[in-house]
Amino acid sequence: MRKLGFIVFILSNIFLLITGCVPSQPTEDYELLPSERLINKLEANRRKIKSFEGTGTIFVKTASMDNSATFRIILQKPDTINLTVMGPFGIELAQALVTKDKFTFYDALQNTAYVGNVNSNAMQSIFRINLSFEDLLDAFIGSVNLTSNLYRPPDTYVVEDDKYVLTYSDSARSNTTLYRVDVRQLAITDYEMYGTENQLMLKGSYSGFELLETVAVPYKIGIENILDEQKINIEYRKINVNKKNIVIDFKVPDDATIIKW
């Protein structure tokens, strides 16, 4: 726990050092899909993105901090996240390499690397929000995993203005999930998860879409964990998807202090 607190302290200090929607068109111009076809298309689009590289600004707000930083992220499905946090003039302040099993977090200011096994505490310390590895992969890309809904109909399915609106209830987990999907670009614009007594627990918002590899990819992403008071907003300036020969340039210096977590 002391090491966890130390990593959180370091990341907080690093942040402290760094100080569109598509125009509306009538839905009559588009074929309205049955729910099964819609979910299949959304999930197929999500799976088209095999690799992702983006640069932009990330805004992190929790009960203990409210800061922003310039960042670069490389994602290689199914098992690699590489995040670089940069300061003024593009100076590297910190870098993290996370796979499903292991992580390395390098603090360039202290020339110290923290290595260990991936678990919920490690993920929250590095990315400052309580999400699983798979959910983080999707969060940075601006997608939502719909695999569990491929073979079951939604509890409700309606069209409101230019949005499909679907809800799914999960009695085993006592929650209900709502999705709003843009009719034109078949992209999820809003995601909400409710718990018992209709309490909002988690929500996501996605906007500023551009078609990349025939997939609508958002340049603005917001993820909020209501219960844990954690919020991340991402604004991308540049995105590349499915780039060939993508390179992750991450090597801990030979003289760095290594701390096993």
Residue map of PLM features:
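C-terminal low-complexity, charged extensions that often adopt amphipathic alpha-helices
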Residues: 118, 126-154
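Sec-dependent bacterial lipoprotein signal peptides
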Residues: 1-21
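N-terminal leader/targeting segments and the immediate start of mature chains
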Residues: 21-67, 257-261
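Edge/loop elements at the starts and ends of beta-strands within beta-rich repeat scaffolds
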Residues: 44-52, 64-67, 74-79, 96, ...
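Solvent-exposed loop/turn segments connecting transmembrane beta-strands
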Residues: 63-66, 86-93, 197-200, 226-231
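One face of beta-strands
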Residues: 52-58, 67-73, 79-85, 94, ...
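An acidic-aromatic
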Residues: 80-134
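Gly/Pro-enriched, hydrophobic low-complexity segments
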Residues: 153-261
